[in-house]
Amino acid sequence: MSRRLSRNVSHLGRHYGGRNLQYRGGVSIVLVHGRCLTGAVWDLVAEGLRGRGRRVEVVELHRGSLLADTAAVQEVVDLLEEPVVVCGWSYGGMVITGLAVGPSSHLVYLCALMPAEGESAIELGSRHPGGLAALVDTDEAGDLVLRGDQLDEILWPDVGSETAAAARTKLRSQAMQSFREAPPRVAWRQTPSTYVVGRRDRAFHRHLVDEMASRAATVIEWDTSHSPLLSRPDLVVDLLARTDAGLA
């Protein structure tokens, strides 16, 4: 594995003994994080899946644009034999939509943006503004950041104080270009997809969620906020493990 490629994969080498991309054959699960956060936000889900013997890769984004983020995930997917299960949370849905994956794989949109042709994150968000808009700001470099007194209430109100505090440590800035670009392709048109709706999601407007969810082959609703990967990692693990088993 090249040094450049190893940077595409999140903290799995540190947390899981350097087993990055050692697998060949079978079904792998690729996890893609949301805006202004790091891949470590998936730690609870990744640990749960690996505890069940699943093959998991967490990809770090923040490459400067949506196209670069998509290329980083594509590089990892290309090293894994299809079928793969690719799960994108929040902004991660923009990324997984642009992947070149075949009909034997599966896309899971976890409270995520699910764009059609020509739709950027900014365009989707402005169509039906949700609570996330109240958190968006820019830093001195002009990059997007999430902050404000309502951050916990909007992003993860259904987690404990320790989990919320840990999640805040994973926040970082992200290049605005990531939100201006549309995906290079729309993978869900040929690859089976599942959309997970959080009934108490305050980050995305429900009208937008319903519009995007209607594009998926399967829709599941959970009684969660925008961040079930933190509040109900057990549900996410069960869903991805079942999807993985269905493709094996």
For the regions a protein language model found, what residue spans apply to each?
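Gly/Ala-rich beta-loop-alpha elbow adjacent to hydrolase catalytic centers
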Residues: G88-G92, I96
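Flexible "cap/lid" loop of the alpha/beta hydrolase fold
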Residues: P103-G148, A175-F179, P184, F204-H205, ...
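Conserved HGGG/HGGXW glycine-rich cap/lid loop of the alpha/beta-hydrolase fold
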Residues: S28-L66, V85
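Catalytic His-Asp charge-relay segment
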Residues: T191-V197
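Conserved loop-alpha-helix segment in the C-terminal half of the alpha/beta-hydrolase fold
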Residues: G198-L230, T243
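Glycine-rich His-Gly loop
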Residues: V32-R35, S90, A112, G198
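Active-site loop/oxyanion-hole signature of alpha/beta-hydrolase fold enzymes
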Residues: R55-V85, A121-S126
